[in-house]
């Protein structure tokens, strides 16, 4: 670990440059269009024009298949985790770690390569919190799986996990930076699921195995 990265007052310029570099890397990692590529390469389709219009793993599952959806899910998880772990490797503060993670989320939701239309940040957010505070990340995943096993609705599971995230972070004693970013990430996921929430309220949201 580089000592000056823990003491910005000692040498501010390297800290700023390192932070900006990691933010750029985080965004580029997040914007890697794994779901879009799976649709193009395997089915010759543009996921933005299919189903929910998302490039995430759920839309891949519905329109491409289970195997590709699993691969896309793992890649998307890795994008969020890697962005945070790079910041940790360079010894950056909690606040800069969470900014790197948020950059990955932003890249996933608004990828420059796809006209700013990407996924819904669930898998990438999961990876981000595995990197920041893995017990909280695993707890959210457990909550997600519990809801999906009962109701078989991915969006409902995502919404419940997003709501539970900041609560779990507070209970776990996470730092102020981690608590704040858990709330921000939760709001980002909920905002991306606003159409799903409308369908959930109307009772028209499809279950696993049904077309959107």
From Swiss-Prot:
**One GO cellular component, as annotated:** plasma membrane
- Give the multimer and partner information: Probably interacts with PlsX.
Molecular function (GO) terms listed?
acyl-phosphate glycerol-3-phosphate acyltransferase activity
Which pathway, metabolic or otherwise, does it act in? Lipid metabolism; phospholipid metabolism
Q: What is this protein called?
A: Glycerol-3-phosphate acyltransferase
- Cited function: Catalyzes the transfer of an acyl group from acyl-phosphate (acyl-PO(4)) to glycerol-3-phosphate (G3P) to form lysophosphatidic acid (LPA). This enzyme utilizes acyl-phosphate as fatty acyl donor, but not acyl-CoA or acyl-ACP.
| EC annotation from Swiss-Prot or TrEMBL | 2.3.1.275
Q: Which organism is it from?
A: Parasynechococcus marenigrum (strain WH8102)
Q: Which GO terms describe its biological process?
A: phospholipid biosynthetic process
Under the heading InterPro entries, the entry gives: G3P_acylTferase_PlsY
């Amino acid at each position: 670990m580089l000592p000056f990265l823990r003491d910005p007052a000692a040498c501010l310029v390297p800290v700023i440059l390192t932070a900006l570099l990691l933010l750029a890397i985080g965004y580029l990692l997040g914007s890697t269009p794994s779901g879009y590529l799976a649709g193009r390469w395997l089915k010759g389709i543009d996921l933005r024009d299919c189903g929910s219009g998302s490039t995430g793993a759920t839309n891949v599952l519905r329109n491409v298949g289970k195997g590709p959806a699993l691969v896309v899910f793992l890649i998307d998880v890795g994008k969020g985790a890697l962005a945070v772990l790079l910041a940790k490797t360079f010894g950056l503060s909690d606040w800069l770690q969470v900014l790197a993670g948020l950059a990955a989320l932003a890249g996933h939701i608004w990828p420059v390569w796809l006209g700013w239309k990407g996924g819904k940040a669930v898998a990438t957010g999961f990876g981000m919190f595995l990197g920041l505070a893995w017990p909280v990340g695993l707890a959210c995943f457990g909550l997600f799986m519990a809801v999906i096993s009962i109701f078989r609705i991915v969006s409902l599971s995502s919404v419940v996990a997003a709501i539970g995230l900041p609560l779990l972070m507070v209970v776990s004693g996470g730092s102020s930076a981690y608590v704040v970013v858990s709330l921000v990430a939760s709001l980002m996921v909920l905002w991306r699921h606003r159409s799903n929430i409308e369908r959930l309220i109307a009772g028209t949201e499809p279950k696993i195995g049904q077309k959107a």
